[in-house]
């Protein structure tokens, strides 16, 4: 095994990534999971409210929620996502010595699995996992569009911000894999529009009518009744976000902007370190057989990016948003690879010295963070 590592340094980078992920996990489980724990406590006990689907499912199995369940569910979801992505990469590229650099730049990116480990318990990873499923299942029938709509509804019920976070990427995957690959007719176009309207209506219902209908003191008391250790009241200090109106969220975000904006150069540097991957992605788009496909893919990338710009203006978890934006780019890359191409696009070269240096740096960065870089 050592000889193989020495012959192919990209295998060594994979091993380093695995070790870093273990380290991030060990560090993460020592931190109090404030908001993720509350998400396991909140259910539809008081009626339809936002951010309550996960807690409602948990309530079906247990009346008392232990703290370790945050890490157990988060860890299980992370492992499932890892398995799904490994399967997707195998389907798209295969695992060979030539594809290893591409795999390291995606799976080993601090934007992707390493940051999902750092944000263990948060809801972002559910959008990624469901989008990967849509990249794996057959896409020829309306059942695919219906499945995408169902996934989008589930994501909005988990957290309404998914309408901006992963639903645009899911729409892009549906357009590429179903409408571009199999053609459009009045039936599937009408079905897609109705599905989009239904998901949008659910978002507005969750955002504007999904507020908690009882006083905050009653809500906190209900949360305490579901805690396995009610003495840990410190874990409930963010319960106020279920009462916070959109205007207050935007105000807080802009109030912190002068400080948080300092992280933008770091984000730009992290994005630049993925230049070999972005170059491959651009060449992949340029090699598409259809000009229409090329224009629609570029429009989709702009649309997904604009959704994240809106998120940046509304909520200040900038490190999470930029990381999930990069993950969306990775997933759309896989979708584009499934479209007909006029020519073969060369993979990321393992022989280029600059690429090797960038791959090493990307590997050594353990995460991007939640609000500010690292």
Model-derived segments and their meaning:
Residues 145-171:
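Membrane-interface alpha helices of multi-pass inner-membrane proteins
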Residues 22-30, 188-280:
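Membrane-lumen/periplasm interface segments of specific transmembrane helices
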Residues 45-76:
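Short hydrophobic/aromatic helix or loop-helix immediately within or flanking a transmembrane segment
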Residues 130-145, 179-181:
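Membrane-interface transmembrane helices that cradle and orient dolichyl/undecaprenyl
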Residues 44-52, 98-137, 158, 314-333, ...:
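Membrane-interface micro-motifs in multi-pass membrane enzymes
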Residues 75-98, 133:
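Transmembrane-helix motifs of polytopic, lipid-linked glycan transferases
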Residues 166-196:
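Perimembrane helix-loop-helix junctions
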Residues 112-123, 267-340:
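Membrane-water interface signatures at transmembrane helix termini and the short loops
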């Amino acid at each position: 095994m050592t000889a193989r590592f020495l012959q192919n340094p990209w295998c060594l980078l994979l091993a380093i990534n695995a070790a870093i992920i273990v380290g991030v996990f060990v560090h993460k489980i020592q931190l109090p999971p404030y908001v993720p724990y509350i998400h396991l406590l909140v259910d539809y006990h008081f009626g339809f409210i936002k951010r309550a689907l996960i807690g409602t499912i948990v309530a079906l199995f247990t009346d008392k929620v232990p703290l370790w369940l945050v890490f157990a569910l988060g860890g299980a979801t992370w492992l499932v996502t890892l398995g799904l992505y490994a399967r997707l990469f195998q389907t798209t590229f295969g695992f060979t010595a030539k594809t290893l650099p591409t795999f390291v730049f995606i799976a080993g990116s601090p934007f992707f699995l390493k940051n999902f480990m750092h944000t263990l318990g948060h809801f972002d990873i559910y959008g990624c996992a469901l989008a990967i499923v849509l990249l794996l299942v057959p896409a020829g029938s309306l059942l695919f569009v219906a499945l995408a709509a169902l996934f989008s509804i589930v994501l909005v019920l988990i957290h309404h911000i998914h309408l901006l976070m992963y639903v645009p990427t899911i729409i892009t995957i549906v357009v590429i894999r179903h409408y571009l690959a199999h053609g459009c007719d009045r039936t599937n176009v009408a079905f897609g529009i109705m599905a989009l309207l239904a998901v949008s209506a659910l978002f507005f219902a969750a955002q504007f009518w999904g507020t908690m209908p009882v006083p905050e003191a009653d809500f906190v008391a209900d949360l305490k009744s579901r805690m396995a250790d009610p003495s840990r009241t410190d874990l409930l200090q963010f319960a106020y976000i279920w009462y916070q109106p959109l205007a207050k969220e935007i105000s807080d975000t802009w109030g912190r902007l002068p400080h948080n904006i300092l992280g933008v150069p770091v984000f730009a540097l992290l994005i630049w370190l993925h230049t070999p991957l972005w170059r491959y992605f651009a060449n992949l788009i340029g090699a598409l057989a259809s000009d229409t496909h090329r224009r629609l893919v570029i429009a989709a990338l702009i649309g997904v990016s604009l959704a994240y710009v809106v998120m940046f203006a509304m909520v200040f978890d900038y490190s999470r948003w930029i990381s999930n934006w990069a993950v969306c780019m990775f997933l759309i890359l896989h979708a584009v690879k499934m479209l007909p191409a006029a020519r073969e696009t060369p993979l990321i070269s393992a022989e280029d010295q600059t690429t090797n240096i960038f791959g090493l740096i990307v590997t050594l960065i353990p995460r991007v963070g939640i609000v500010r870089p690292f």
